[in-house]
Amino acid sequence: MTDAVLELPAATFDLPLSLSGGTQTTLRAHAGHWLVIYFYPKDSTPGCTTEGLDFNALLPEFDKAGAKILGVSRDSVKSHDNFCAKQGFAFPLVSDGDEALCRAFDVIKEKNMYGKQVLGIERSTFLLSPEGQVVQAWRKVKVAGHADAVLAALKAHAKQ
């Protein structure tokens, strides 16, 4: 698959992204590398913790394939710092409190929470090529086996 599966607004690549550890980056700063961006609802919740740990366990394989990983939620940098320290994540988490990145990737969805309709992050992952094209998207992600599936897709795309 070489065609983009999601067209991102050009401005998305220059959005300032606040990372765990207090640094900033942009998507453009990752040009030339494969990039896995996974969106998750909330730090330190069971599913989000498992997903992060699964990506972290496979980080050497993602590195070997030339990919960087960014996890994204609406939590604060401080929350991300605590989450990373507690779980030992070796990749950065993006604090998207203003939802700019979430909206660019269209992951803010209406969800049913305790009988009420609320807007929240739909667990989603996107694989960006070194040229910045979204070449694969996973929406409504089920955590079990997901990081393995993303790694397999990365390897398949990298061979093309």
Curated annotation (Swiss-Prot):
Disulfide bonds join 48-84. SUPFAM superfamilies: Thioredoxin-like. The keyword Disulfide bond applies. GO terms for molecular function: thioredoxin peroxidase activity. GO terms for cellular component: cytoplasm. Changing residue 84 to S: Abolishes catalytic activity. It catalyses: a hydroperoxide + [thioredoxin]-dithiol = an alcohol + [thioredoxin]-disulfide + H2O. Transmembrane segments: none annotated. Keywords: Antioxidant, Disulfide bond, Oxidoreductase, Peroxidase, Redox-active center. Residues 4-159 form the Thioredoxin domain. The keyword Disulfide bond applies. Its EC number is 1.11.1.24. The active site is at 48 (cysteine sulfenic acid (-soh) intermediate). It comes from the Bacteria. GO terms for biological process: cell redox homeostasis; cellular response to oxidative stress. InterPro entries: AhpC/TSA (IPR000866), Peroxiredoxin_BCP/PrxQ (IPR050924), Thioredoxin-like_sf (IPR036249), Thioredoxin_domain (IPR013766). Belongs to the peroxiredoxin family. BCP/PrxQ subfamily. The active site is a conserved redox-active cysteine residue, the peroxidatic cysteine (C(P)), which makes the nucleophilic attack on the peroxide substrate. The peroxide oxidizes the C(P)-SH to cysteine sulfenic acid (C(P)-SOH), which then reacts with another cysteine residue, the resolving cysteine (C(R)), to form a disulfide bridge. The disulfide is subsequently reduced by an appropriate electron donor to complete the catalytic cycle. In this atypical 2-Cys peroxiredoxin, C(R) is present in the same subunit to form an intramolecular disulfide. PANTHER family: AHPC_TSA FAMILY PROTEIN (PTHR42801:SF4), THIOREDOXIN-DEPENDENT PEROXIDE REDUCTASE (PTHR42801). Thiol-specific peroxidase that catalyzes the reduction of hydrogen peroxide and organic hydroperoxides to water and alcohols, respectively. Plays a role in cell protection against oxidative stress by detoxifying peroxides and as sensor of hydrogen peroxide-mediated signaling events. Monomer. This is Peroxiredoxin Bcp. The gene is bcp.
